[in-house]
Amino acid sequence: MAQISNNSEFKQCSSSHPEPIRTKDVNKAEALQMEAEALAKLQKDRQMTDSPRGFELSSSTRQRTQGFNKQDYDLMVFPELDSQKRAVDIDVEKLTQAELEKILLDDNFETRKPPALPVTPVLSPSFSTQLYLRPSGQRGQWPPGLCGPSTYTLPSTYPSAYSKQATFQNGFSPRMPTFPSTESVYLRLPGQSPYFSYPLTPATPFHPQGSLPVYRPLVSPDMAKLFEKIASTSEFLKNGKARTDLEIANSKASVCNLQISPKSEDINKFDWLDLDPLSKPKVDYVEVLEHEEEKKDPVLLAEDPWDAVLLEERSPSCHLERKVNGKSLSGATVTRSQSLIIRTAQFTKAQGQVSQKDPNGTSSLPTGSSLLQEFEVQNDEVAAFCQSIMKLKTKFPYTDHCTNPGYLLSPVTVQRNMCGENASVKVSIEIEGLQLPVTFTCDVSSTVEIIIMQALCWVHDDLNQVDVGSYILKVCGQEEVLQNNHCLGSHEHIQNCRKWDTEIKLQLLTLSAMCQNLARTAEDDEAPVDLNKYLYQIEKPYKEVMTRHPVEELLDSYHYQVELALQTENQHRAVDQVIKAVRKICSALDGVETPSVTEAVKKLKRAVNLPRNKSADVTSLSGSDTRKNSTKGSLNPENPVQVSMDHLTTAIYDLLRLHANSSRCSTACPRGSRNIKEAWTATEQLQFTVYAAHGISSNWVSNYEKYYLICSLSHNGKDLFKPIQSKKVGTYKNFFYLIKWDELIIFPIQISQLPLESVLHLTLFGVLNQSSGSSPDSNKQRKGPEALGKVSLTLFDFKRFLTCGTKLLYLWTSSHTNSIPGAIPKKSYVMERIVLQVDFPSPAFDIIYTSPQIDRNIIQQDKLETLESDIKGKLLDIIHRDSSFGLSKEDKVFLWENRYYCLKHPNCLPKILASAPNWKWANLAKTYSLLHQWPPLCPLAALELLDAKFADQEVRSLAVSWMEAISDDELADLLPQFVQALKYEIYLNSSLVRFLLSRALGNIQIAHSLYWLLKDALHDTHFGSRYEHVLGALLSVGGKGLREELSKQMKLVQLLGGVAEKVRQASGSTRQVVLQKSMERVQSFFLRNKCRLPLKPSLVAKELNIKSCSFFSSNAMPLKVTMVNADPLGEEINVMFKVGEDLRQDMLALQMIKIMDKIWLKEGLDLRMVIFRCLSTGRDRGMVELVPASDTLRKIQVEYGVTGSFKDKPLAEWLRKYNPSEEEYEKASENFIYSCAGCCVATYVLGICDRHNDNIMLRSTGHMFHIDFGKFLGHAQMFGSFKRDRAPFVLTSDMAYVINGGEKPTIRFQLFVDLCCQAYNLIRKQTNLFLNLLSLMIPSGLPELTSIQDLKYVRDALQPQTTDAEATIFFTRLIESSLGSIATKFNFFIHNLAQLRFSGLPSNDEPILSFSPKTYSFRQDGRIKEVSVFTYHKKYNPDKHYIYVVRILREGHLEPSFVFRTFDEFQELHNKLSIIFPLWKLPGFPNRMVLGRTHIKDVAAKRKIELNSYLQSLMNASTDVAECDLVCTFFHPLLRDEKAEGIARSAGAVPFSPTLGQIGGAVKLSVSYRNGTLFIMVMHIKDLVTEDGADPNPYVKTYLLPDTHKTSKRKTKISRKTRNPTFNEMLVYSGYSKETLRQRELQLSVLSAESLRENFFLGGITLPLKDFNLSKETVKWYQLTAATYL
């Protein structure tokens, strides 16, 4: 016996006899009487038609029919009927109507037992087709569609491949086997069924002995006659029945509205009198229509003869009963078995929107126009955002010149000690009307307005008649204006001019004469905010595929195929085309295929295999009469294919609506007049159902065996509790592969405890297929599960409603799993993402999050002085820590408990908020109260509150309000971090977005930088949509002028990118030709436009200088692009354009270095850093500023051979070549010392690695700088298993040679050490700033910065917990370690070898000889008649070496000239001649190895003879060699030759040699006292003197006198062979009180350590400690004396 279980599934009872149930049945007599009356009426109508055409059913036909495999079995039999008849004796022509109906009701007519039984039995044709639900896994001939129209949502169905225990599945469990039992089977209902509204008696048993036969597509003529005979009843009724008011008004659509009386007591019954089963498909859904919103009378349908009789015989006053697809659900309880109770899914109103009906009442396919409009409906959140931006826009009217100047303002940086040395500068100002510029000297502290007044004095006699405010100073060569209210020296342009020692050129203009084409206009102010209007030119890496136009095309194609399928004779082929159209729609929707779509497609395939009904054109002599006299109330029998098509269309439109809502992030729950419940009162647990992942690639199917999800809930970047793992499942295949879980996930947290910013994370993992051999990774056998992708979803929407309904979440592959809370996932190309279907509960009310009420009148502030001393000390220690990183749990608890004691220390607020125990609603009132009484933070301190650790909207809004105090120029420096901080905003319309857009409205430089940063961020997988919206808002409010300029820049970047790609792909020999041809296209762009440089918008280019364009010989083959400045007063513009490398990391490193430089400048330390610009213009491409007059260290060193990196002089000699005078060289050396110190500190703090001589550059002015920051934060480049960067930073001996001015240490090296330590300590004070800046960049996707762990290097490098003195000692040791590292030189050497393939002669614009800046020819200088090495001289520079005097006599000259060359310069000449003339026989060069010292007189004398012989042989060689430009350049006189410097040095110039017993020099000490300890730091000693003039090995020894036992002896390490040692060592004396120390003296002695004799005294000093103020540090130089020492 079959019955309905409590979970609405059928169960087979063990007993064959059911227990009696107290229900009431219509007895047999009543039922037969009703049937007889109906048949009598039909017989009467039949007499009006022609006599039936008879035919015989042959035995062969019967056998063929019996031969079919029948997969369906009847569940119901009627024992009161006669026994089954054999078809062999039937004469169809003689059959009466009643006999035909009997055949129809005979379950065993012309059937026989099939060879194989189906998985699940199905109902017989006589069973009610209206209330029959097929199991999801069953196959049969009846179509899976509803008979007749309906207006409800289809219940949840599941693909047959993934059987699911649904609410009701045809009365049987899917796991129930088939049973060909002859015993009676009963259908019964549980007694406690809540939906059963009438009693039933025990049901009449059914005998499942037969089933409806499966029909072939083609039937024999004999069978066709029988079918025609049986169907004639329905045909007559169908074609002859007059239309009545009982017919529904809309019969054309696939789904129509049916009104069901809510008062009906009988909900679900099976009607057994289905008299025309062949004209209707069997229904696979049992659904109840419930429309509470519509109150009008229901419409009843009659779809078979028995229904027509029942409807016609009813009294007009009879109560209209509930109908399901035209079947009565109440009235007389006519039963053959107990009816089934079935509840359907909830209905959606949208079904009616896709139904239409023409005036004739015929059926038509839905157009879906109302649904398509949903794709154009703007997201509610986006609409609210547009309104907010429009309101913001009104605050910046175009008439306000302060916020809308139309030109760029020169950025300013405040410098300390600006009025020191060289405070006056020379200014040259171009004035209209004057032929020559006005030149005068002014103070750098003077305001720009004063400079303007000085310039106006040259053209106006009376300034009282002049409006000084209408004049501006424009930078020559740039569209950039100085700010009148700032001092001249604070502008970055002026600072760069002073740095490069170039002339300051300005132009005096009136405001009206200044180009203001970037200003907004009245039309711009009136234009509405449209986020998509100006994005059409933006290259979107992830294309939108769900727009109305493509969806409309797909739907049109689908409906066209449906119409063809319904009209064509060959429906099999047409249905295949329909299914293909459905597949295309699902493919366009990212491969999402809902269960209803899957089931509808299967039912359509089954329906097309059914025999088609007799068409309407059946010939009949009295057909028209028949139609006129048809019985009222009867309807067309439904076409099975039509019904299946209707349900398929419904499923497709449901899918489209779901996808549209998900794409627009719309809620699935209608708001309307629903009740609202506050979240803090909701005690329900958070739960949802993970249904499936759609669009799985075939690679995953072959590589992974199982899949599972990790579900986590986070807030403030941390999990609220342990993540939950789903079950492990495999993949399935319908249209596409999918992973199906259908699993309920319940989090152990109540909704009331959820913070507003709670984020759900779903991470997909794959378990590798151990048997898969197709994977290229052989190690997969040993690997664990792999993370395949991640997606995040905020639980409360922007209106603060809890999410509900079905969501499609876009999950990205493992290379993009850096998901951040609050992301609106960005859609990609079809099948490039995985779509995760998640179903949230849809309660009857909305849950909304409301903020707690804050009592602002309560002010609590505890005084820190009232705390106990130990608690106070601990609290101050935590407060004064530089960062909240590394706070322990105990520290956080302690800090939170004492938070009100910290109000006088505002900058500790981030630490306190990070220590909050939780952010539950119940605790927010206290937290917000603390926030609102907290003193304002400075902008840089408030920046930390924008990190992921602080997701609370109140906190972030307050932080942004404090940010308002930051200047535009400071904001421009931090803009990349602000752009990344947008990812931590939960909603689009945030205070941070409005803040950035407001600053962009008031400053063109910020708008320009923000544009390129947002454009580059469009490539972000998770946040591309958000950045697209912000970028659209920026372009919408920025004005037409700015948009047109940005469009031109983007076009220029695209053109240069194409050129760079072509050059990279070209072969080496054709690259230059390809470059020149490709640049012609770029040149054509400039013929139509002038264009601002994306790198620096103040630079405007008007054309290319194609002849100067080239490419660099490196892996990426970057372009050197030379452009002509549009300003005739400006210089050429040179930039590098690179394709194939990610420049975002370079941008970050350069930004950090620039911020460091500004910190140093504000503190008065100018390290003369070279800050060049870098901009990423797209994925793996960008533009870099070229620093003029600079070369790499490799180029400089290889001029001295491949081993040049092991030599000490190349850098010094290269600088001397470009700075020939002593004054110039001294200035260049000073620039080198300062810039080298800054580079050492910056590269160490940032952990910049992969440092070799090809990414360190030197300018001719002496400024050193680094390029190429592909490795940083300590991620070193590996050489095998060894780190290539073994030293803390690059400081080589050739650098030290320039710093010292020679081989021996001097006081200049002490200056270098002091500069390094001072710069290091200044950066250490800003540890929190740099950690915050880097932390905000974690979600940017940089390969070297992926997690908070990467910041550990920076924190350790900055040593935040040490004192300045300890940090000074620490960094001094780093300098010593770097200087003594042979690994750096070896790394340089290896790189020289690797770059040999790029070696050769320099290009025309490079010097041919290292010591000569230009190339000369004999045409200019005249031919040489005689040349010889005249003599040699000893020279000090500062080391001793010999220089050779070459005597030259030229044609046409009577007097010889002399040039001075070193032996190394002769050798360079020979080496380069060998390169130029590899096939010529050159004279041999005297380069034999010299043992011992080389710079001695004997060696010089021998070399003089050898070099003279070499020159004679060279001049007697071929004229091609002897008269080449290289030889001419070698003999061309230099500035040093003309001044005859360095030939002989006077005796007084010889290094000082002290007389016996002479003492000299000074020592620099730092003396401080704290915590009962005296600290003596020995820093430097300078100008030591020895008896014999040899370099000593100094060290320092100290005592605290009196000390008879010498227990206070302390000493430093020994510094070898130097008169100017640097120690920076701390000598500590512990356990001394201040009173005791005032009675002591510090005795310091400097001695030289000797190995073969006794150490000798170099000087000393005795310092009474009572003269020191021990409460502060004292740093001072002390002169050494000849005092006695212990």
Curated annotation (Swiss-Prot):
Domain PI3K/PI4K catalytic: 1105-1383
GO molecular function list: 1-phosphatidylinositol-3-kinase activity; 1-phosphatidylinositol-4,5-bisphosphate 3-kinase activity; 1-phosphatidylinositol-4-phosphate 3-kinase activity; ATP binding; clathrin binding; phosphatidylinositol binding
Modifications made to the protein after synthesis: Phosphorylated on Ser-261 during mitosis and upon UV irradiation; which does not change enzymatic activity but leads to proteasomal degradation. Phosphorylated upon insulin stimulation; which may lead to enzyme activation.
Disordered: region residues: 1-26, 41-68, 615-640
Region called Catalytic loop, residue ranges: 1247-1255
Subcellular location: Cell membrane; Cytoplasmic vesicle, Clathrin-coated vesicle; Nucleus; Cytoplasm
Domain C2 PI3K-type stretches: 682-841
Cofactor remark: Ca(2+) or Mg(2+). Mn(2+) cannot be used.
Region (Activation loop): 1266-1292
Location of region: Interaction with clathrin: 2-142
Region (Interaction with PtdIns(4,5)P2-containing membranes): 1488-1493
Residue positions, PTM N-acetylalanine: A2
Short sequence motif named Nuclear localization signal, residue ranges: 1606-1617
Disruption of the gene: reported phenotype: Chronic renal failure and kidney lesions. Affects podocyte morphology and function.
CC cofactor: Ca(2+); Mg(2+)
Ranges for domain C2: 1559-1678
Purpose: Generates phosphatidylinositol 3-phosphate (PtdIns3P) and phosphatidylinositol 3,4-bisphosphate (PtdIns(3,4)P2) that act as second messengers. Has a role in several intracellular trafficking events. Functions in insulin signaling and secretion. Required for translocation of the glucose transporter SLC2A4/GLUT4 to the plasma membrane and glucose uptake in response to insulin-mediated RHOQ activation.
Entry similarity comment: Belongs to the PI3/PI4-kinase family.
Protein name: Phosphatidylinositol 4-phosphate 3-kinase C2 domain-containing subunit alpha
Organism the protein comes from: Mus musculus
